[in-house]
Amino acid sequence: MSYRKLGRTTSQRKALLRDLATDLIINERIETTEARAKELRSVIEKMITLGKRGDLHARRQAAAFIRNEVANSETGQDALQKLFSDIAPRYQDRQGGYTRIMKLGPRRGDGAPMVIIELV
């Protein structure tokens, strides 16, 4: 099993990826470090694939991972609803490769390589 530890314990790493995945679903593009983005890419691919399946079990599996945050305050839509109703239908004919990683410069404070990860 191959994954990045990201300098965290298992629970901290899972919480970080849940937060990043929820933010990416809500905003559709976020700025983060390269290592986090590469690890997030595999998580988001799985979430969108669950969204494309669309059955009750897939919805419950995604709900267990994605945080319960409001994606659109006007409609009251949360992140899970956005994943299943807006994002997943967009990729119905695409088999994977739902994200794009674009490199930015290094972070000013510590020189960490920064990237923008966005939904294609």
Curated annotation (Swiss-Prot):
Record's keyword terms, sorted: Ribonucleoprotein, Ribosomal protein
Cellular component GO terms, alphabetical: cytosolic large ribosomal subunit
GO molecular function: structural constituent of ribosome
One GO BP annotation of this record: translation
InterPro entries, sorted: Ribosomal_bL17, Ribosomal_bL17_CS, Ribosomal_bL17_sf
UniProt subunit comment: Part of the 50S ribosomal subunit. Contacts protein L32.
HAMAP family linked to this entry: Ribosomal_bL17
Protein family per UniProt: Belongs to the bacterial ribosomal protein bL17 family.
Name the record gives this protein: Large ribosomal subunit protein bL17
Phylogenetic lineage: Bacteria, Bacillati, Bacillota, Bacilli, Bacillales
